[in-house]
Regions:
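Anion-binding and metal-coordination hotspots
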Residues: 2-4, 62, 69-82, 93-94, ...
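Hydrophobic alpha-helical membrane-insertion signals
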Residues: 1-27
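Secretory-pathway/luminal and periplasmic proteins that interact with or process carbohydrate-rich
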Residues: 86-91
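Basic, short loop/linker segments at the boundary and entry of helix-turn-helix/winged-helix-like folds
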Residues: 22-63
């Protein structure tokens, strides 16, 4: 006996909503997008032209597709014909893949995604899933949609640029020495700039034209032969100079694209070459990618941004600015790992924002070890006399204050140091263990007072029962979001190019992670 099956018979229900379960991902997508205020969609509205697909519908089908690990515009278009979820959300409409891709990369899409995150966070707070006490920040690297061999390195461009200028200067000196062109007033005696190179080519053109005219007017075979021989070298040099000018312009364009970065990809100029965690060949190969920063609570991504620099330290300040300006007011506690611990970041959070950083620094775990605490040659373990301002080394010698110094990093942040020097390191039995200075020189130490105070403050915060408990949640709060994104959602590489489009796609992927997590939560409840 078989169940009744007839392909030619009308099947009920015609209303697809009946087929969608109450806790289905499509319903959560629908509820989230419907909660976004109508004002957020006003920029899409146009009085003229063919009526457009409603942006609410387009956003719903994108979020639903991303939640099912479908990122391609063509595959999303196919889902609109195959998936009951997508048919219900689209209400029978079937936008083409071109329409889907154009909507995904629309200039208004970023603001719309911000509204998604804001509404989703408000819902979590309302349902008391999160308490807005702290945010947990971390970053991961996602590979860009670019060829891994399309690299341009800043050092190489600068090296070839210098070589090109030197070569052009030698050509100029040769032309002047042979009296082919007259000497020029250069801005700098030892070098030559692009404008001056163009002027040299113009003078060289004039000199070659004169030679051409002499050849045309001369009746003597020997004279014409002599002039042609004389003209040969200037023509070669002119060709080299023209090539140098074109290359100089290319190098300038490349440096302008690079800005403060050390590399970029020709396929996606916004992407920077960095080491990925997914290094299957174990050879440290650099790939073009973006540094994705997220802020989470309760394992939900509440804000995000993309950065071109591979290190997390320089991303914290601009990321906190983005959170405040586009998402929500910062809570009392900012929690992150040691990759974000720096004097500049501590100053920004404690002094400028008046908040509490629960961020370890590079040597924090090392300093907790018994071996480190018992090491007599670590300056952190040396006795300090606050009244007379000196340190005492393991040999009982005093290190007296000598002078103040200031160091600036490449970002322009200034750090102040107090330099102390030992009275006498000669004949010290511990010299080989304590001092790396040359024989005859005394041991010097540089103490950053502000940095030491900040480290003491962080140690106190992490030792406190309440704040220490909050910091311990970091690993189980922010890391699972990346695990879900890469392992479950299988989002390991962008499908679009350019930072603007990549940021939109990252927002769609993170919101898809949030919705799937929220679906699991509501199913348990």
């Amino acid at each position: 006996m078989y169940k009744n099956y007839n392909i030619n018979q009308l099947v009920l229900p015609l209303n697809l909503e009946i087929k969608i379960q109450d806790n289905d991902i499509a319903r959560h997508v629908n509820n989230l997008v419907e909660s976004i205020p109508k004002k957020a969609f006003d920029k899409y509205y146009k009085e003229t032209g063919c009526p457009a697909y409603h942006p609410r519908m387009m956003l719903k089908i994108l979020l639903c597709a991303y939640s099912q690990s479908i990122f391609s515009g063509r595959k999303i278009e196919a889902l609109l014909s195959d998936s009951i979820r997508m048919m219900w959300l689209a209400q029978g409409y079937s936008p083409s893949y071109r329409t889907i891709n154009r909507f995904r990369s629309n200039k208004e899409m970023q603001e719309l995604l911000c509204q998604c995150f804001i509404q989703f966070r408000a819902q979590l707070i309302k349902e008391k899933i999160i308490n807005n006490e702290a945010i947990f920040i971390d970053g991961t690297k996602i590979e860009a949609n670019a060829n891994k061999f399309s690299f341009v390195w800043k050092k190489a461009v600068e090296k070839y640029g210098i070589s090109l200028i030197e070569n052009s200067r030698r050509i100029y000196d040769e032309l002047v020495e042979q009296e082919i062109i007259p000497a020029m007033e250069l801005e700098q005696e030892a070098t030559i700039n692009e404008k001056e190179m163009v002027e040299v080519v113009e003078k060289l053109d004039s000199a070659i034209e004169v030679m051409d005219k002499e050849i045309a007017e001369s009746d003597s075979v020997e004279k014409r032969k002599r002039i042609r021989h004389k003209r040969k070298r200037p023509k070669q040099l002119r060709k080299i100079l023209k090539d140098n000018i074109a290359r100089k312009q290319k190098y300038d364009r490349q440096l302008a694209i690079m800005e403060n970065r050390n590399s970029y990809s020709k396929t996606d100029p916004d992407a920077t070459f960095m080491r990925m965690k997914e290094d299957y060949m174990k050879n440290g190969q650099l790939k073009p990618g973006y540094n994705v920063q997220i802020a989470t609570e309760g394992q939900y991504a509440l804000a995000y941004d993309l950065f071109p620099n591979p290190t997390d330290t320089r991303t914290l300040k601009p990321f906190l600015d983005v959170i405040e300006s586009s998402y929500f007011a910062l809570p009392e506690y900012i929690v992150a790992d040691a990759g974000y611990g720096s004097e500049e970041n501590y100053v920004d959070i404690i002094e400028n924002r008046q908040l509490t950083p629960l961020i370890t620094y590079g040597m924090y775990l090392k300093e907790q070890e018994r071996r480190y605490k018992k090491d007599a040659f670590k300056t952190a373990n040396w006795d300090y006399d606050n009244a007379d301002d000196y340190y005492t080394c393991p040999n009982g010698k005093r290190l007296i204050f000598k002078y103040n110094s200031q160091r600036k990093d490449k970002n322009g942040f200034a750090r102040n140091f107090r330099v102390y020097e030992c009275e006498d390191c000669c004949n010290c039995p511990y010299r080989s263990q304590c001092c790396k200075a040359k024989e005859g020189n005394n041991r010097k130490i540089s103490i950053n007072v502000k940095w030491e105070q900040q480290k003491e403050y962080i140690r106190a915060q992490l030792s406190d029962k309440k704040t220490g408990k909050i910091y311990k949640r970091r690993k189980i709060d922010v890391e699972p979001v990346f695990g879900f994104l890469k392992a479950n959602l299988r989002f390991n590489r962008f499908t679009v190019r350019g930072k603007f489009k990549a940021k939109i796609e990252m927002g769609l992927a993170l919101m898809a992670v949030n919705l799937r997590k929220y679906m699991q939560h509501t199913a348990v409840v």
